[in-house]
Curated annotation (Swiss-Prot):
It catalyses: Na(+)(in) = Na(+)(out). Pore-forming subunit of a voltage-gated sodium (Nav) channel that directly mediates the depolarizing phase of action potentials in excitable membranes. Navs, also called VGSCs (voltage-gated sodium channels) or VDSCs (voltage-dependent sodium channels), operate by switching between closed and open conformations depending on the voltage difference across the membrane. In the open conformation they allow Na(+) ions to selectively pass through the pore, along their electrochemical gradient. Keywords: Cell membrane, Disulfide bond, Glycoprotein, Ion channel, Ion transport, Membrane, Repeat, Sodium, Sodium channel, Sodium transport, Transmembrane, Transmembrane helix, Transport, Voltage-gated channel. This is Sodium channel protein type 4 subunit alpha B. The gene is scn4ab. It comes from Tetraodon nigroviridis (Spotted green pufferfish). Residues 824-865 are annotated as: Disordered. CDD domains: Na_channel_gate. IV repeats lie at residues 1220-1517. III repeats lie at residues 896-1211. Voltage-gated sodium (Nav) channels consist of an ion-conducting alpha subunit which is functional on its own associated with regulatory beta subunits. Residues 825-838 have a biased composition (Acidic residues). One of its GO terms (cellular component) is voltage-gated sodium channel complex. Residues 369-393, 684-704, 1116-1137, 1407-1429 dip into the membrane without crossing it. Glycans are attached at N209, N284, N304, N339, N1074, N1088.
Amino acid sequence: MGTLLPPVGSEVFRRFTPSSLNEIQQRQQIKEERKRANAEVSEELFSEPASDLEAGKPLPFIYGEPPHELLNVPLEDMDPFYQSQKTFIVLSKGNVIHRFNAESSLYLLSPFNSMRIFAIKILVHSLFSLFIMATILTNCVFMTLSDPPAWSKTVEYVFTFIYTFEATIKVVSRGFCVGQFTFLKDPWNWLDFMVISMAYLTELVDLGNVSVLRTFRVLRALKTITVIPGLKTIVGALIQSVKKLADAMVLTVFCLSVFALIGLQLFMGNLRQKCVLIPPVVSNLTFEVTNSSHGYFGNDTRGNDTENKDLMFEFEEHINNPDNYYYLAGQRDPLLCGNSSDAGVCPESYICLKVGRNPNYGYTSYDSFGWAFLALFRLMTQDFWENLFQLTLRAAGKTYMIFFVVVIFLGSFYLINLILAVVAMAYAEQNQATMAEAKQKEEEYLHILEALKKREEEQAAWKEALKVQEPHNFEDDHKLCPPCWYAFANVFLKWDCCSCWRHLKRCLSAIVMDPFVDLGITICIILNTIFMAMEHYPMSADFEELLSVGNLVFTGIFTCEMVLKILAMDPYFYFQVGWNIFDSIIVTMSLVELGLANVQGLSVLRSFRLMRVFKLAKSWPTLNMLIKIIGNSVGALGNLTLVLAIIVFIFAVVGMQLFGKNYKDCVCRISEDCKLPRWHMNDFFHAFLIIFRVLCGEWIDTMWDCMEVSGQTMCLIVYMMVLVIGNLVVLNLFLALLLSSFSGDNLAAQDDEGENNLQIAVNRIKRAVAWAKTWILLHLCILTESNHNQHDAVSDEEENRITKNILALTSVTSDQFFKVPIAEAESDSEDSDDDDVDEDKHSRCDESSFCSTVQDPEVKENEADEDNVSKMPMDCWSENCYSRCPSLDIDTSQGKGKVWCNIRRACFIIVENNYFESFIVFMILLSSGALAFEDIYLEKHQLIKTILEYADKVFTYVFVVEMVLKWFAYGFKSYFSNAWCWLDFLIVDVSLVSLTANILGYSELGAIKSLRTLRALRPLRALSRFEGMRVVVNALVGAVPSIFNVLLVCLIFWLIFSIMGVNLFAGKFSYCFNETSQEQFDKKIVNNKTECIALIEANFTEVRWKNLKVNYDNVGIGYLSLLQVATFKGWMEIMYAAVDSRDVESQPIYEVNIYMYLYFVIFIIFGSFFTLNLFIGVIIDNFNQQKAKLGGQDIFMTEEQKKYYNAMKKLGSKKPQKPVPRPENALQGLVFDLVTKQIFDVFIMVLICLNMVTMMVETDEQTKEKEDILYWINVIFIVIFTTECILKTIALRRHYFSIGWNVFDFVVVILSILGLLLADIIEKYFVSPTLFRVIRLARIGRVLRLIRGAKGIRTLLFALMMSLPALFNIGLLLFLIMFIFSIFGMSNFAYVKKEAMIDDMFNFETFGNSMICLFMITTSAGWDGLLSPIMNKPPDCDPDLENPGTTVRGNCGSPAIGIVFFSTYIIMSFLVVVNMYIAIILENFNVATEESSDPLCEDDFDMFYETWEKFDPDATQFIQYSKLSDFCDTLKEPLRIPKPNTIKLISLDLPLVPGDKIHCMDILLALTAEVLGDSDEMDTLKATMEEKFMANNPSKVSYEPISSTLRRKEEEVAARVIQRAYRKYLLQRTVRLASFTYREKTEGWGTKKAPETEGLLCKQFNQLFGNKRETEEPLMSKNDELGQVELQSEVLLHAAPPLNTLELLLGTSERESLV
């Protein structure tokens, strides 16, 4: 770290001079010379720039404060990375680093040129940035003007000049484009360059459409990002998350394309089917109109006479005339209909024909792939999809609800949340990277500080100074204000004038700091909130007076509290506490509001009183925590919010510039009265509202208008950009930030803060109550004793028991609050008592349970078997019952007790029997199913009604019997201590009461009817019987406390907005309405309620003073309004009423109060985005906590172990496959070679893509030629795919069907052929277009084969597959909730008036229709339209209306029941179940991503076994050791070990079995360890995985390794060592012998004795040199035999034949040395 230390003193900051530049040039030359000389340049230390010294960042504190004269001056670069490059830095105010290129700018201006230095000074000056920022903001203001003044052109020139000046300064100071850090090297400057270029281009050249070019000016707003440093970071994060989204986007587009193709095939042309008036002429003709097979009249005409031609002409004109279509009230599109049995039907005298254009200006349809894709995209984003759902079901039939269920659950929930998961993960990764970087910096700085300390310690003179000054400096550093302020504060803000004043302060302090005062203030806050919430419209004068007085009292209390606290604490210390500042602001605002109470328009100040509610956070930990989370998120979201604001601004201006004029010119296309609609882009504010609405997820409605007035292309582009950039990315990042604020630590941290004042006060009260209770009980006992002078054993025992209870109560209550150490004797006695009690209890429990005849309880206890305990009934009653009624405790060993015990045992055996349980489940399902038949048509089907009545009795009796049996079997104690049994008990009670009332003839009573409704809860009994649902319910129940807490906090948040709404809008949503024309009166005719009432009294019966059903007249209905706004359903009507509102009881005027839109914008941000997303955060966090409690596998594993575990988990489930053998037949062999080539698969994939394209080209009502061409193309594709199928079957034979994808291909081909052959037959003989269309869907199956080739998509689909079991359980629970609510709906809303969204198809009349409605509401879609008719009151409905075929009268709903019904369902399904869905997808996506990012993934193991097949064709699981090198080289990365790999493979130490073979598992384990890095702790895991492999592969040969590769190598090395040693020994002998022979020959026969005279070596030597001694000794001696043995051993050692001794003994080098 020493090298990173900054230089000390004047060395730190050095001016950049010509000599500095020369030094850099010299360094560069040295570097280049080294390169030329091929010397390595030592760049390892500084291979990249220091992150702390990046341009734009402040100088690290470690470098110290630069001298003032060196600011804004060129300095030498401090970053070691740049010290050998031509750069210099400039430090501006705040020590911000700016880096420049040291080359001459524009080839003219050197770094030392005064002009360039001046430009640099301007550029880095903080005022210059501020000036540019101000210019941009001013320019933005001018851009928002829809009708700019005449002088704006001049201002535009000024802006252009300023931007040009800025660019010039940048170019002069930095250079243009050559070299580092020049103007164009920064991508953000490209933006400036483009903006300026476009400005000049539009001025100098006439380019036609100026409005399009003017929109480029809006990009100037992006310049704010370049000016504010933090924004660059957040934009970088956004770009990163978009990159990560690539795979998710591809999958989304692919799935949408598939769904769009399905929609195209199923619903093509359906949405053009309308109800057309039957012409009067036709009724007189003999045409069989309704039986026409083609559905319209033209095909029925015969002959060519003129009359028919005229008729034909008139008929065409008639059916294409929109006036002849049937329209519902208030609808601009005609009523759709269908020809299938479950589709929508037309009213009388209307017929269903396919004519005219599609709904919504013709933009909602499935007639071509493009429109189908748009429809499905809309469905996926859930925007106004209820409209598409209703239109499609009305035209095609209710059966197709299945299509929407699949798309909503797979498309909408999965894909949209997958995008959320990806963004959240990208954010989390970035967070981790930032934290890691911060940690690294911290470590670096610590090292630097240590080094600096050492350096300073060397200077002895500084030591004392440091000791004295350090603490003082530390304190001074934390003083934010100048010293004069502290002097002022000490004099004026600390009141310590005299001792009596200080005494008063102490007294006041004791009062105001007392916990009871805090409790009192909290109660006052709650009461004040209740008082504010009681405000409503209309209010009596007395009630208004009461509220006013209450407000004065509370304001007085809070003012008094503030004043007393200020006196007690002194202002200086009072304002140090955040909560006190908050209090003081609210109190001040309340006092100001009282002063300005009568000033018109300032009633909004009353809303500040609502902020008092937040004071509850002081004593409510959850509220405090959630406010902190929101606070933290808002802090982190500061930059993100700014980016969002910039995006909204840019798109609003773009929209205004591109489409504003068109809205004005073509307004008649979208508005009947040719006035601008509420949603338009003619001015900036309305354009902003549209963009905000798109960010809320509502885009399709306004896009239709845009497309109608401005053309389709531009509108689609702009809207899709807003949707993708704004909605999907920014809002998801927003949610990711919110989720990241949640953690278990966050929630747990609250417990560590200790008790607050409120808890202390409550605990004191509890203790006081407990003491009082004890005292009263004790005195009552004494009183009773004195009154009754009977002291028998029973009363003594009773008294002891009471005393014990009192003592127990006392100990419990005191123990709760004080932890007192217990003495040993005390604790022992307590324990022994407890043991005795348990023993007594156990013995009686055994006695009653076992019904044994054995008298001795101890013997009984010893003999009891655990299995028997579980199979015997429990105690019948609880402990208290036995103590109060001793007669209940009967002897079960004899007499009646024994009989009783046997009966209970028999009951127990029955209820524990699986058949009994199955029977009950079957009865529950039957009884639930029976409820579905009780619809409005039941009266017409008397047989079904009678069957249901008898069935109801049977079910009730069965369930009563079951309940009684369980009472007998389990006993009351066990039965009623189980929550599920309680549920059963209550449901059976309801059925029993209902049945009794029916028998007694009271079934028509209102109370009994309501009770009968509760039978809908019967299906809940299924919960305890189905494991999957029970798991989900248990998880939910675990999360209930957290969810309830958040719900409560949301209600508090919403309460503030609701009260504010009541203050702003109470009584202002009413209007005078003309029933005849269905329009509001104009303000000029009727100004207020008084004038409207006068009109009504003047006998105008069609006039009514109406109020909006959902309004802000009180807090309760205000909550409903907010729920509609938060779910974006029905919010338009509320907003329109708000912006049109004037005064109480005044007639509204169009957009008179337009800025009230901002109330809703603020609520949506805080009330919807934040609070509703908190639910997701809480649920995910709660699941993580539950998982931690359960102790999931991964909690006890390190990251390294987790990697091993994942790899081994995948590895253990694999086994080597036997490859498909190549056929011996030559022809089959050729086909086999063809179909197994990769190019063949690629070719088929290309064909599938082409096939998909041809399917996309299909449109409704296409020409005959096009139809024929597409038909034959389809035939060609079917032929090709059939050929592929046949070829593969020929080549692979029976093995073809062993591969899943092949089976899928085969099924698709068969279906395609059937579709082709049966199409004509079906169309001709069975008029069922549905069946025909479904068969055509088989072609889409081919497209799914593309998934096989895409790895990235496979990961995402793997996440879905992992989620499926859990999602299925949630789906079951959701279905159960829907089922129960459907039955409730049928009971309560079956006869509601048909209006809004309740009509002949979507209603609660039948079970099927109810389910359709509830499926729609599951995503909160259209619930406002279903609630609206239910909230009708007379005269909007008729309570006495007779409903044919039933005794039920009236068509009015029940508003209270309706609101509770829909609110409960939305909270349960939308907020809980759907959010659980999201939580599971996020969880599993993380797991899947971890798995895919693991060093080894599934594909790597597949690749291993695919390669193995080639080396082990018989699937023996072994290969020869000699093949190992080739095998490892053939593998792909990361498992591959490329050649030369011999040494590497030896080091793997692979076990060898007889025959020099190695097992596949051993190789794979070794290669896995090689990739992951070997570790000792993994040995056990490896053993486990081997066992798993053995279990998965019973065919695996059990083997005992005889050696290993490493051991084999060691043996070979040892053998070589022995060989060398022996060779050396033989060489020495040979040399001695050769030497002797040479001397003997040169010097004659000497007298010296030969070194060796016997042995094989000597013999061979003599033969070689022709020694005579050889011939003299013809017989072989004993030594020769020994020599022969020597030879054999030597041959073994050398493994070579003994041809020539010298060659045998010596290698080449030895031979040469010997010669």
